[in-house]
Amino acid sequence: MTADTRWTRRDFLSTAAVGMIGLGISGSSAEADERFAYIGTYTNAGKSEGIYRLFLNTATGAMRIDGVAAKSADPSFLALHPNGRVLYAVNELESFGGKPTGAVSAFAITRESGALTPLNQLPSHGKAPCYVSVDHTGRTVLVANYVSGTIATFPVRQDGALGDARAIVQHTGKGPNAERQEGPHAHCIITDPDNRHVIAADLGVDGVLVYRFDEKTGEMSTVGNKVATKPGAGPRHLAFHPAGRFLYVINELDSTLVVYKYDGGRGALEQVQVTAASPGGAAKNFPADLHVGPTGRFLYGSNRGDNTIAVFAIDPASGQLTAMQQVSTGGDWPRNFAFDPTGRFLLVANQRSDSILSFRVDAETGRLTPSGEKVEVASPVCIRFR
């Protein structure tokens, strides 16, 4: 995908059949291939040095770590530019350059080796940035700052480096959980499939907030579409269905998943369903991440405490979810997870047990099967395939 193209509902529907062939649904066996991913980590415990490079054998699920791609402080979440030539990372710090803020970094990617070369690093305009994404045109990087409850946008320069922040928004409010919701805590920020709105999840104020987005300038403006979740729910991460009609929200504090019908023209959300993120799982469970699978037919969510990946079937008409499977992640505290570009494997980062495991993905049923393969990485938090 180039910097000037975007993924639309028409693209998704018209290429679904081709995508299924690429996922191996046709029954043909693809030749063994090796793909690589970048691993974001926490370095504050002294065990990790920054961003690591992982290679995956897409025939067996075997993995290997190829050293440190870039030394960086607490690069906890990563995003890839649509052109595949630049990687962005938030540095989840509360102090940077002598000021009460974290940072966001840009790295040029060497085409052949995947080596990272620092381009620049800027203040994130808030403490402890925990999420970074890139809009569909590749012109704007978006950051959510957890501790400060701010979101910010940064223009992307010609070489992929970041320009000074274009828009900064301070969230306000609090929730009923005195320990976790004493103030705003922005946890996720993405653009919608048409690139017309920015959607942000704020764990501290129990809100999913919608902003009008100017893709040419990176400016955001309030449209008044704040959707309040159940008090104490703590919305954490967001995922759109590729067809653009549904938004999925995973709530960290009450361990639920919420399905919203999405009107892209108005940036409006209508709640459709609330269901358990870990059906029948541990009493103390803190969901972390969620993704729609490669075929668009299944939703996956990670559960910390329960230490599982939950799999749900998606009703194509209503977007509603039906629980199908829960599989152990083989480690402790699964944070981010990712599908490899072929769609054959899902990799999950177990933060507290310093491990990444791979799972085979059945493209027909959506079910996961452990590959038996595991690799050790200190405090892995994010997996981003190139």
What kind of region is each of these model predictions?
Residues 24-42:
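C-terminal segment of N-terminal export signals and the immediately downstream linker at the start
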Residues 43-46, 93-97, 148-149, 205-206, ...:
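Short glycine/acidic-enriched loop and turn motifs that connect beta-strands
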Residues 72-83, 125-136, 172-195, 229-246, ...:
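Beta-rich, blade/repeat-based domains predominating
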Residues 2-20:
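N-terminal secretory signal peptides and thylakoid transit peptides that target proteins
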Residues 55-60, 108-114, 155-162, 212-219, ...:
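Short loop/turn segments immediately following beta-strands, especially the blade-tip
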Residues 115-187:
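Asp-box/WD-like beta-propeller blade repeats and closely related beta-sheet repeat scaffolds
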Residues 64-69, 118-122, 175-179, 223-228, ...:
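A short beta-strand motif characteristic of beta-propeller blades
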